[in-house]
Amino acid sequence: MASPAGNLSAWPGWGWPPPAALRNLTSSPAPTASPSPAPSWTPSPRPGPAHPFLQPPWAVALWSLAYGAVVAVAVLGNLVVIWIVLAHKRMRTVTNSFLVNLAFADAAMAALNALVNFIYALHGEWYFGANYCRFQNFFPITAVFASIYSMTAIAVDRYMAIIDPLKPRLSATATRIVIGSIWILAFLLAFPQCLYSKIKVMPGRTLCYVQWPEGSRQHFTYHMIVIVLVYCFPLLIMGITYTIVGITLWGGEIPGDTCDKYQEQLKAKRKVVKMMIIVVVTFAICWLPYHIYFILTAIYQQLNRWKYIQQVYLASFWLAMSSTMYNPIIYCCLNKRFRAGFKRAFRWCPFIHVSSYDELELKATRLHPMRQSSLYTVTRMESMSVVFDSNDGDSARSSHQKRGTTRDVGSNVCSRRNSKSTSTTASFVSSSHMSVEEGS
């Protein structure tokens, strides 16, 4: 069985400081007589003044401020997002349910992982006990998996709603099942990290690490699988779906579909897709340096001896953790409903003014879900009957309108002004499943 030092030197677990971060502050290099190419170290109870990686007080203060700001903004912002959706019936939609799941995962990651990991990286000593050691190795992968697959579920839902709107949408029960399945799969993926977590009490300090039965190669293989499953694969899926959706929404105007109601729907769909693309791109950018760091330090282990490696780790980890705080800011900037919700949440601030329009944005009544489903079905039937209107002698125009049905329910009603009530119902129901679109 590989030694703890060997495992740590090979590749630390997700959210763990690099070997240099553990070695630099509380240890000194081992004698150079060993021919092993991997970094090795001998723990010592106190850091000596000659340690080149010891953080000066001003650097510790700056890093502490940076990490503290991320945690404060991420936890507060995501809790407000959860409150906005759960406290207002109009916001309880399929897509917003996934946004709540995303916000919960991000808030938990920031609150339970960021500061603890920062302290461990900075001090090189584990202060939090064996149980939290297991949790600390286990939860980061779980939370990141839940976050990115919530985004993936939104991307697939948007794809189905825009590309094939006549197919049934996810019900509230189905949405809960999808969210539950995401967390179950996340737990299964992260379980080995919990199973192999160890605490080692040494003279002068305590270490928390993951000790794999077959050593560093098994550890590296596992983390490459994790990177593929929680980064590469979901980003590929979202890239494909949003590309197709973007081509559909921005590919040009549909001839004949020029009524105001349809144009409003199209504009709203473009806004929400743009917002979600920004969320996904932000996540990808924030986590990319972190993944690159671990891959490079695992392959080129001599990098762990570089005197600036601790700074590189702290910077890449801060950027990854900062991904948890950007989503609430994006929602507030790009969506009217969420902006109104944030104003209500911070109305106690003297410079925040909540207008009557903001109140109306969140309090406007909506149809009951069952009634929505029935109206949606009736509207589809009415729309189809309009397409095959026997009074229309222009077969080419009928054929065009039939194609428009698959593009958007609202376009059917606009292109055939059969009745005002049909147009109103169709346009409302086509966007009722996603309040983000309504408020964009």
Curated annotation (Swiss-Prot):
Gene3D superfamilies assigned to the protein according to its UniProt record, in alphabetical order: Rhodopsin 7-helix transmembrane proteins (1.20.1070.10)
Membrane topology per record: Multi-pass membrane protein
GO cellular component: plasma membrane; sperm midpiece
Membrane-side (Extracellular) residue stretches: 1-59, 115-134, 198-220, 297-309
GO biological process, one term: positive regulation of flagellated sperm motility
Key words of the record: Cell membrane, Disulfide bond, G-protein coupled receptor, Glycoprotein, Lipoprotein, Membrane, Palmitate, Receptor, Transducer, Transmembrane, Transmembrane helix
PANTHER family tied to this protein: G-PROTEIN COUPLED RECEPTOR TKR-1-RELATED (PTHR46925), NEUROMEDIN-K RECEPTOR (PTHR46925:SF1)
This protein's name: Neuromedin-K receptor
Originating species: Cavia porcellus (Guinea pig)
